[in-house]
């Protein structure tokens, strides 16, 4: 006891040393933590800057693969949804590049007109046409397509056929017919055509498969829920297919696109964000193999410059799945729906008078 009383002050100092050491060392640890945060922030900023630089190079500087690398002169390109808009423009530009064209769409008269236009502009180009309604999903139609392309060297497949809603609509109010048509055309139509074309490409160990995606598949899109889901499905399917077919020398890309002037988008006026089909298709075919604004998505591309910048901003800055982004998307489509309903009422009133 005397020992404890005698040395109590020393013992007290001894046991107070760790806390005193912690107090003295705290500024050092704070400095280390601060530098660690600065380093992490710097790494984040630099990595984002390098990624953005890569996007700019891909969009504006670096060329894509040559179209001729996918097949020799005299090989064929199959284009679905070929009678209008993007499909028609893909057919025109691929014919200009020297490919023979198989045109597949619903309306026979439009296909015949386009076929005549192609052979008139490019006399050396051959065409074949098949009128089929993808919404019907008939085995007989796909059998006809199989027989049509059976002996052809199909080097390019453009999966362009697609359908959206007539106007933005809550899922609960979506008609069963519209819902079924969207899924059948966008998903089953694309899968079944691709499955007919792929075996020949695998045998020849070359080919190009472009599937038209949408920002609706990149961003959850309220009031276009079924369409958005179908395009998200194509994103996952195409990416998986791209990995499967890469060992066979086949290039697979899902093309992420914002609005384009077309009958489906119902947009008629071009702008910096909304190109016409000619400008858009030119960007797609000149940037094959480049991610454009989609560096984080394997086997995908956003090749048109403004779409690419928007895709980069959404995926790398704001994110695509957050409540704020999805909420803004909902508000935009609610506004579009209101305008569409008012327009329908006006047209209904004009017809009744």
Swiss-Prot record:
GO cellular component, one term: endoplasmic reticulum membrane
Cleaved signal peptide residues: none
GO molecular function: ketoreductase activity; very-long-chain 3-oxoacyl-CoA reductase activity
Positions of transmembrane segments: 33-53
Pathways per UniProt: Lipid metabolism; fatty acid biosynthesis
Binding site for NADP(+): 78, 133, 141, 160, 227, 231, 260, 262
Predominant location: endoplasmic reticulum
Subcellular location: Endoplasmic reticulum membrane
Membrane topology value: Single-pass membrane protein
GO biological process: fatty acid elongation; secondary metabolite biosynthetic process; sphingolipid biosynthetic process; very long-chain fatty acid biosynthetic process
CDD domains: 17beta-HSD1_like_SDR_c
Listed InterPro entries: 3_ketoreductase_fungal, NAD(P)-bd_dom_sf, Sc_DH/Rdtase_CS, SDR_fam
Protein family (similarity comment): Belongs to the short-chain dehydrogenases/reductases (SDR) family.
Protein name per the record: Very-long-chain 3-oxoacyl-CoA reductase
Protein species of origin: Aspergillus terreus (strain NIH 2624 / FGSC A1156)
Taxonomic lineage: Eukaryota, Fungi, Dikarya, Ascomycota, Pezizomycotina
């Amino acid at each position: 006891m005397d020992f404890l009383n005698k040395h109590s002050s020393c013992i007290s100092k001894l046991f107070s040393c760790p806390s005193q050491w912690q107090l003295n060392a705290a500024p050092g640890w704070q400095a280390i933590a601060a530098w660690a945060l600065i380093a992490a922030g710097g790494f984040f900023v630099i990595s984002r800057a390098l990624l953005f630089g890569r996007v700019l190079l891909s969009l504006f500087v670096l060329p894509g693969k040559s179209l001729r690398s996918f097949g020799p002169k005299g090989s064929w390109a199959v284009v679905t949804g070929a009678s209008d808009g993007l499909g028609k423009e893909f057919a025109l530009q691929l014919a200009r590049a020297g490919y023979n064209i198989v045109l597949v769409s619903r309306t026979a008269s439009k296909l015949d007109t386009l076929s005549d236009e192609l052979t008139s502009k490019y006399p050396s180009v051959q065409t074949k046409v098949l009128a089929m309604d993808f919404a019907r999903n008939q085995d007989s139609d796909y059998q006809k397509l199989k027989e049509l392309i059976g002996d052809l060297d199909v080097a390019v497949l453009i999966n362009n056929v697609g359908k959206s809603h007539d106007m933005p609509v809550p899922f609960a109010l979506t008609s069963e017919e519209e819902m079924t048509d969207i899924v059948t055309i966008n998903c089953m139509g694309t899968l079944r055509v691709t499955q007919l074309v792929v075996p020949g490409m695998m045998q020849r160990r070359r080919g190009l498969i472009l599937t038209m995606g949408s920002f609706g598949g990149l961003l959850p899109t309220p009031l276009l829920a079924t369409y958005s889901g179908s395009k998200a499905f194509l994103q996952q399917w195409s990416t998986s297919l791209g990995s499967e077919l890469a060992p066979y020398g086949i290039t697979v890309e899902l093309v992420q696109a914002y609005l384009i002037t077309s009958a489906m988008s119902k947009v008629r006026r071009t702008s910096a964000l909304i190109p016409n089909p000619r400008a858009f298709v030119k960007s797609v075919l000149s940037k094959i193999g480049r991610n454009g604004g989609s560096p984080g998505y394997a086997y995908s591309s956003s090749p048109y410059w403004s779409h690419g910048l928007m895709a980069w901003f959404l995926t790398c800055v704001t994110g695509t799945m957050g409540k704020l982004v999805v909420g803004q998307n909902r508000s935009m489509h609610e506004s579009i729906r209101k305008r569409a309903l008012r327009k329908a009422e006006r047209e209904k009133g004009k017809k009744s008078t």
